[in-house]
Regions:
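Conserved catalytic motifs of ABC-family nucleotide-binding domains
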Residues: 163
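Helix-to-loop junction immediately C-terminal to a conserved catalytic motif
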Residues: 59
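ABC ATPase C-loop
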Residues: 159-160
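Conserved ABC ATPase signature
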Residues: 142-146, 150
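Conserved ABC transporter NBD signature motif
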Residues: 67-76, 87, 120-125
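Helical segment within the ABC ATPase nucleotide-binding domain
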Residues: 182-196
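The feature captures the beta-strand-to-loop junction immediately N-terminal to the Walker
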Residues: 44-46
Length: 246
């Protein structure tokens, strides 16, 4: 960690980010948020609010028209996506984005494609098999034949293969049985609480997302409209009316 980040305790800082797609559709309008070192933060909002756009912008897959992104005390909005992975940023994308014709093992090795140390790559492979034992059982199976829950485990495990310090997850519960979701969230909470992994979690399941995080932000039509501790957001009239049906 850089001295600046260590002094402030902030790992990620998004400052007044504006993002628009080529059609001119504005997706983010002056978004600012912070994630502190070792913190788990939830980003919630309805479909089309801009949650996925924000994660892609942080990961370097989209470029902001204006605003700044800082990571570990350094400005990174001009840094290419693969180089952001080297900095310790990993994204588990919505819909998993697996290579369906490749095996589980081959998908996992793609998570370490920039690591030339075979011993370290094997260590990480054993580590993710320990977190998700079913993947060891399916190691030679094509990713396209996995169940939804197994596919999500593989997507998360692939991201963990890069040894991230900052992990972003986009709708990890989408299309998965509740008991599998609980199992996946348990693993993420263990990594966060026991190993200090910093997490930014995007979820439409607002209670589950806020239960897994210390703080949260509410994104609405490209703008942050609320932020606070998880409990304060659960208690807020805005969240209760818009997302909890109360």
């Amino acid at each position: 960690m850089s001295p600046a980040a260590q002094a402030s305790g902030v790992m990620l800082s998004v400052r007044d980010a504006h993002v628009a797609y080529g059609t001119g559709v504005v997706a983010l309008q002056g978004v600012s948020l912070e994630v502190r070192v070792g913190e788990a933060v939830a980003l919630v909002g309805a479909n089309g609010a801009g949650k996925t756009t924000l994660l892609k912008t942080i990961a370097g897959l989209l470029s902001p028209r204006s605003g700044e992104i800082w990571f570990d005390g350094h400005r990174i909005d001009g840094v290419e996506a693969p180089d952001r992975v080297d900095l310790g940023i990993a994204l588990v994308p919505e819909g998993r984005r697996l290579f369906s014709r490749l095996s589980v093992a081959e998908n996992l090795r793609l998570g370490t494609f920039r690591d030339r140390d075979p011993k370290r790559r094997q260590e990480m492979l054993e580590r993710v098999f320990g977190l998700f034992p079913v993947l060891r059982q399916r190691v030679d199976q094509r990713a396209g034949t996995l169940s939804g829950g197994e596919g999500q485990m593989l997507s998360i495990a692939r991201a963990l293969m890069s040894r991230p310090r900052f992990l972003m997850l986009d709708e990890p519960s989408l299309g998965i049985m509740p008991r599998i979701v609980d199992s996946i969230l348990d693993v993420l909470q263990m990594l966060h609480r026991q190993e200090g992994l910093t997490v930014l979690l995007v979820e439409q399941n607002v209670p589950a997302a806020l239960a897994a995080a210390e703080r949260g932000y509410v994104l609405q039509t490209g703008r942050i409209v609320a932020e606070g501790t998880s409990q304060s957001l659960l208690d807020s009239d805005l969240v209760r009316r818009a997302y909890l049906g109360m």
